[in-house]
């Protein structure tokens, strides 16, 4: 499936945002960067990304850091069974973080995403 075909499917659903996950999107940063850039140009959708990498390691890799420019929320870190916690929102283990990527890039430090379930 081409990037344009995926983009058309994403844009056809006006209510859903976008999640990049499984496998690991950071294994194919160029393709996901192309798709994320197109989504941001043509919609107001939020993009979440799940990765086994840490935010800090992604920043050190120029190809992966480029993708971060289009990501709104990053769930970083490998799932660790011994840290599993079913009470966490949007992640499976306590070592994984929810990161507000755009705020982090602006502040030049890691900024946690604050989920508000009441909204």
Q: In which residue ranges do the predicted regions lie?
A:
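Conserved Radical SAM active-site core
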Residues: 1-67
């Amino acid at each position: 499936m081409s990037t344009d075909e995926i983009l058309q499917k994403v844009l056809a659903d006006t209510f859903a945002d976008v999640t990049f996950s499984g496998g690991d999107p950071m294994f194919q940063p160029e393709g996901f960067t192309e798709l994320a850039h197109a989504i941001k140009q043509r919609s107001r959708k939020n993009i979440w990304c799940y990765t086994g990498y840490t935010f800090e390691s992604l920043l050190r890799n120029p190809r992966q850091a480029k993708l971060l420019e289009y990501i709104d929320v990053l769930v970083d870190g490998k799932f660790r069974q011994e840290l599993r916690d079913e009470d966490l929102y949007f992640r499976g283990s306590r070592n994984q973080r929810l990161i507000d990527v755009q705020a982090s890039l602006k502040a030049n430090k890691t900024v946690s995403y604050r989920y508000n379930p009441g909204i």
